[in-house]
Amino acid sequence: MVKVNSEQRFDADALVGGQFSTRRAFIGRAAGAFAALSGGGVLLAGCGDSPATSGGGSSAGSSSSGAGTKSATIVNILPPQLGYVAEYIAGIDGFYKKNGVSVKVETARGSAPAIQAVLSGTALMCRCGRLESLIAIADRGAPIHAVAFTTRRSPLAIVSDKKAPLTKPADLKGKRIGIPSEGGTSETTLDLLIASSGLSTHDVPRQVTGFTPGTFQLVKKGRLAGFIIGATQMQQFRQAVPDATFMPTYNFVDDGENYIASARGLSENKDAIAAYLAAVRGAMQQVIADKESGYADTIRKLRAKYDFAELKNEAVAKSWIDFLVTSWTKDGDGQLLKTNPQEWQATYDAAVKIKAAKGGVDVMKNLSPPLV
């Protein structure tokens, strides 16, 4: 069983930073960043089929793992959690093996080292936010390609008090909002919410805070009107803070998550990428089919192998998985893991509007056609 300290959570706002306009300019920094990653990263034993091995760019994706078997190194930006339910089930139930791909998984401290690993060739793919991917492409010329959309909804929410609820972006005017960090995806999402109602960023003060149920005391004391959390945390808050109410950002903001690969990785290892995605899609379909039972089979299998905190609470686990399933299938069951040009462009255009991303960039060049 993979045990995870419940306090071991990395801020999802530790996002893409620095300048890497080309793979050549980037690669020196990447080597050091991923060396640190490999020394302290978490290898999710059993999530893939291959044991932990050391290696350079050639190990990221290849056909050298055995006759007819492809290999893929994937970097996650968060420690083990329910957000990776499809990837875990793909390993547990043999979807990777069925599709002829041997998977090695590492964990990085946020998107920056994960993307660096992809660009250096040390990893084949990573999963990160659509908004942050587009900002990296537009502002820093990151030569990355979105090869699949996973979730298709903005993954955040603003929690507030039922006695003074924040239910729509216009309610934010003049209200102090807590954010996990400055300049990250959470703050950018807040700016997108504000813009959607015609307000200015100056209309909504913000301060850096935590994002746990304990942070709600700042709302009770009147120091905050609300603060940003992960939308998958809403059930946890409902149980711990009965006075809490929520404004999910997906009602107002175009965002989601995608798998990204480098241009070289996509060109040289398209078959490995497609095989990996086919395995994850099969696992997604199985989890979706388990909805009628309240995801009982899925949760049982995960508990047999993993020990992260959200699995210990039945209602929280069900709510988290259901949020993911709803997000995977927003565009229909037939669109699982398919890229969507309209959604990609809409997210970029919204980011340009609030000056979160440089305008005039042809981001469609960085979107792969559907691979599964």
Where in this protein do the model-derived segments appear?
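N-terminal secretory signal peptides
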Residues: 1-25, 34-45
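Bacterial signal peptide processing site
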Residues: 48-50
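Short, glycine-/small- and polar/acidic-enriched structural segments
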Residues: 54-210, 221, 225-231, 243-251
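Stable alpha-helical elements in mature extracytoplasmic
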Residues: 83, 92, 111-114, 132, ...
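Pocket-lining segment of extracytoplasmic ligand-binding domains
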Residues: 214-307
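Secondary-structure end/capping motifs
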Residues: 269-354
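Hinge/cleft segment of the Venus flytrap/periplasmic-binding protein
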Residues: 346-372
